[in-house]
Amino acid sequence: MRRCPCRGSLNEAEAGALPAAARMGLEAPRGGRRRQPGQQRPGPGAGAPAGRPEGGGPWARTEGSSLHSEPERAGLGPAPGTESPQAEFWTDGQTEPAAAGLGVETERPKQKTEPDRSSLRTHLEWSWSELETTCLWTETGTDGLWTDPHRSDLQFQPEEASPWTQPGVHGPWTELETHGSQTQPERVKSWADNLWTHQNSSSLQTHPEGACPSKEPSADGSWKELYTDGSRTQQDIEGPWTEPYTDGSQKKQDTEAARKQPGTGGFQIQQDTDGSWTQPSTDGSQTAPGTDCLLGEPEDGPLEEPEPGELLTHLYSHLKCSPLCPVPRLIITPETPEPEAQPVGPPSRVEGGSGGFSSASSFDESEDDVVAGGGGASDPEDRSGSKPWKKLKTVLKYSPFVVSFRKHYPWVQLSGHAGNFQAGEDGRILKRFCQCEQRSLEQLMKDPLRPFVPAYYGMVLQDGQTFNQMEDLLADFEGPSIMDCKMGSRTYLEEELVKARERPRPRKDMYEKMVAVDPGAPTPEEHAQGAVTKPRYMQWRETMSSTSTLGFRIEGIKKADGTCNTNFKKTQALEQVTKVLEDFVDGDHVILQKYVACLEELREALEISPFFKTHEVVGSSLLFVHDHTGLAKVWMIDFGKTVALPDHQTLSHRLPWAEGNREDGYLWGLDNMICLLQGLAQS
């Protein structure tokens, strides 16, 4: 017990008789905030507050304590017209909010002295009754929280929060950096659209859409708002600034790295590499600075972004001088329109007519160019890699068997254009209707070749289009390896050559594809013209691959590990083809022997097939499929260019082709393939 300067020493009985406020003032520790020179304590009867004891005792707000008047406890701030200033405390990053929890701190004008921080802590031994009597705010000293022990409506704020403080009637705005936590009232809430709002006792004002308020110091020490559109507004002193969130807490972005916060739509915002954050909204994403500025968007209007260059210059020039208001990092992200999906183009074959053809292979250049007439490229190396997937994506959105179709997509890829296929019922595939293929499949269902072709289930109408429904050949395989081999000594019909000669039209796309494979292939005239005719290109195409030397060529291979190779345009020599086939089966002699057996059975069926003898089979492929279980099968696919011969005419399918004899060299190529695979299986 220390001696009171105006009274003698007190014994315990006398001390107990004093009012609680006076006794607490006597017991307060030394070393609190000192008075400035020239400011004397007013004597008795000098207009002291009613709470001051007789004899010039301590003020109701003593050194080291933080007492508030009754209006402040009610959350109303100082009484109107009050001119008496209130003391300001300097703490180690912690503020003393009013009882209403609005994060308000008042300060004495033009007085800022930093006392000994040890004197700012109050004794924990004071009873709860004493605290209730004096409305004292205490600092626990254990977890760094400023708490009001009698407020039940306060909630803690995360550690990285930084309060916005409001001065008294005549005081400036200040911002205090905190490292601890501060309690905030749960009832301080506003509409949760992440806009800065100014809550007034009479009205609620909102900032203009797209404006990003910040603060800048002026010459007289007051604070002004700085909007992202360059305008400034004098600060209103009637109420505090609050940053509303959906949970009622007030938060401030860390100056070093922004935290991720949920947007109005519940989406998670993504962290940029420079520390700023992007907040998506209901109709688009916006980019917001990582520190003090928020580019919020109300639900009833769009956000207008200012010019990036003007905004950045304005913010940095006005805010970099303030140590209390870190410069916000604002990044304007231009909106990039999402690329629209490419529509599925019309089929390259003329449907429904005797001269119409479906695609025989997605890797056959000449097939896609023969009747297209539009210069579309079918070579997978010449087309965009995403284009087939866009077509497939459009196709699959109508399918109830998406997973099954994706699993078996390699067969579609190796056997025809993805845009010509859709998934049918389980175990079936829908291929765009072609009358030539329809007639061929209907006849093959009654032919000895029936086991070697996909089962045909007739025509179906789906989504306004007609399809041929056939068997999914990969339904019984697990992780299959697939190879597509184009059979025959030519892949174009004689009628196509005749039509091309009747209407010759040099094509630039044919020239470009020819030069891409062999720059020296075009003649000097073709080089000068920059174009070649279709017959010239088709005949040259056959001579570049093993079609002209072996009667078949490898179109594409998809391995079980997912690798796919279609670069076989120059695979012509026997040694090259042998190496590709050996790699396809990974040197598995058992698989090779099964393939040889299947091909021999197919050859026997072809030699006795009435259909095969009376049809010119051009552009058809053999589909090789095997998997890790040892299952291996071969099918004939793609009959879009299979046409019937004139009456009483048959083909051997082994004779060399000469224009007019209609020989296709199918069996010649099959004989060479069987011989080659037999050699691999026996080696």
Swiss-Prot record:
Supply the Pfam families for this chain: IPK (PF03770)
Biased composition (Gly residues) is annotated at: 44-58
Name the enzyme's class.
Answer: transferase
- Per the record, the major location class is nucleus
Q: Which UniProt keywords apply?
A: ATP-binding, Calmodulin-binding, Cytoplasm, Kinase, Nucleotide-binding, Nucleus, Phosphoprotein, Transferase
Tissues where the protein occurs: Highly expressed in pancreas, skeletal muscle, liver, placenta and weakly in kidney and brain.
Q: Where is this motif: Nuclear export signal?
A: 324-332
Q: Which Gene3D superfamilies is this protein grouped with? A: Inositol polyphosphate kinase
Residues annotated as binding ATP: 431, 471-473, 484, 558, 638
The organism's superkingdom is given as Eukaryota
Record region (Disordered): 1-124, 147-308, 334-387
- UniProt xrefs under InterPro entries: IPK, IPK_sf
Known regulation of its activity is: Activated by calcium/calmodulin. Inhibited by high concentrations of the substrate Ins(1,2,4)P3, and allosterically activated by the product Ins(1,3,4,5)P4.
The entry lists its GO molecular-function terms as:
ATP binding; calmodulin binding; inositol hexakisphosphate kinase activity; inositol-1,4,5-trisphosphate 3-kinase activity
Q: Which residues carry this modification: Phosphothreonine?
A: 336
Write out the biased-composition intervals (Basic and acidic residues): 105-124, 249-259
EC number(s) on file = 2.7.1.127
Q: Catalysed reaction(s)?
A: 1D-myo-inositol 1,4,5-trisphosphate + ATP = 1D-myo-inositol 1,3,4,5-tetrakisphosphate + ADP + H(+)
Query: Biased composition, Low complexity: where in the chain?
Result: 13-22
* Calmodulin-binding: region residues: 509-517
The record's function comment reads: Catalyzes the phosphorylation of 1D-myo-inositol 1,4,5-trisphosphate (InsP3) into 1D-myo-inositol 1,3,4,5-tetrakisphosphate and participates to the regulation of calcium homeostasis. Can phosphorylate inositol 2,4,5-triphosphate to inositol 2,4,5,6-tetraphosphate.
Name the PANTHER family for this protein: INOSITOL POLYPHOSPHATE KINASE, INOSITOL-TRISPHOSPHATE 3-KINASE C
Q: Which family does it belong to?
A: Belongs to the inositol phosphokinase (IPK) family.
* Protein name as catalogued: Inositol-trisphosphate 3-kinase C
Q: What is the organism field in this record?
A: Homo sapiens
Gene name of the record: ITPKC
